[in-house]
């Protein structure tokens, strides 16, 4: 992937950068129709139309591409047909055609090219795009799309540039380092895909203007200190007044900005060797 920096023709293009989409097979191609479904987004509302999650709404209409996170066609090889853009994630997706004719989408790993042959197998070779259990992947290998529980489908390291490093194997568990630098244990029977997720420069893009964020379906975030007291606990006062409390709180009065939100006795605490860096 490359980044294209726009000239300051208008205030909206000043300091703005976009992807050049050079890794895509065809910039004007349409997605595989059998693998797409309509996407109804709730825009942060519940069944009564009341806002339950703020700062959501609008955005461009999208089709959802059904991604194969399980990689459960064991022993059947597949050929990479094309690499496509997916508006629902910052990673690219790759269209596979299996030997039996079935087509599926997967997250595109960095270095996977059109025409490559990949597979999912218990003893698949350690090649980019192949999927196999963690117990059969050597130490130090970089993987993505890692399962939390055997058979649950990949849940870890699916965004652009993400990868998980295998550190150790002991008993029924494998020690891994997550993108957040958290070190934790997962079952050795969990499956993962070899390689790092592509589009590694996605986080170097500069949005450039507010409207581009609205295209993504994100609405503005208003500070509580500029609201009225009826709208937020931080609101009110004369001029630029402080929040007037011993600590920051949410619009509903719960502690915020530094308050730990993870349950202290959560069952998975015993599997975390080292907490993530904040």
From Swiss-Prot:
GO terms for biological process: mitochondrial translation. One of its GO terms (cellular component) is chloroplast. SMART domains: Ribosomal_L2, Ribosomal_L2_C. It comes from the Eukaryota. Its main location: plastid. Belongs to the universal ribosomal protein uL2 family. Part of the 50S ribosomal subunit. This is Large ribosomal subunit protein uL2c. It comes from Chlamydomonas reinhardtii. The lineage of its organism: Eukaryota, Viridiplantae, Chlorophyta, core chlorophytes, Chlorophyceae. The gene is rpl2.
